[in-house]
């Protein structure tokens, strides 16, 4: 496993379905998210957008940056013909959940994970 961030980024974008979107302020990266377009065998939502790793620098939270990023993600998802946008959020992040609900998202599923490598 390669823990070099540059190699991780290159692997992430290699298939062309995932983008890393970075928000900049005064020449400094202050926010980011990953957007992956998923093509599924699902009659109701054959193309979905998966958002992951939404981050805003702590001292800049509450200034609308996160909301602007999520609007950007929606615009990109629609441009890719996605009919649904989804993401996961740690169950302990109540403030983040309320933020997403204010943006119109609904909690619809329970998430499950399984480590495939020993840690």
Segments from the language model and where they lie:
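Conserved acetyl-CoA-binding loop of GNAT-fold acetyltransferases
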Residues: 100-110
């Amino acid at each position: 496993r390669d823990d070099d961030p540059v190699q991780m980024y290159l692997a992430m974008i290699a298939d062309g379905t995932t983008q890393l979107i970075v928000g900049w302020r005064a020449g400094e990266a202050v926010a980011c998210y990953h957007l992956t377009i998923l093509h599924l065998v699902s009659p109701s939502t054959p193309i979905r957008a998966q958002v992951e790793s939404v981050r805003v620098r702590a001292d800049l939270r509450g200034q609308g940056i996160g909301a602007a990023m999520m609007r950007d993600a929606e615009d990109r998802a629609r441009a890719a013909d996605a009919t649904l946008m989804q993401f996961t959020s740690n169950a302990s992040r109540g403030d983040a959940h309320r933020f997403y609900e204010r943006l119109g998202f609904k909690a619809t599923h329970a998430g499950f994970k399984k480590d495939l490598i020993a840690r």
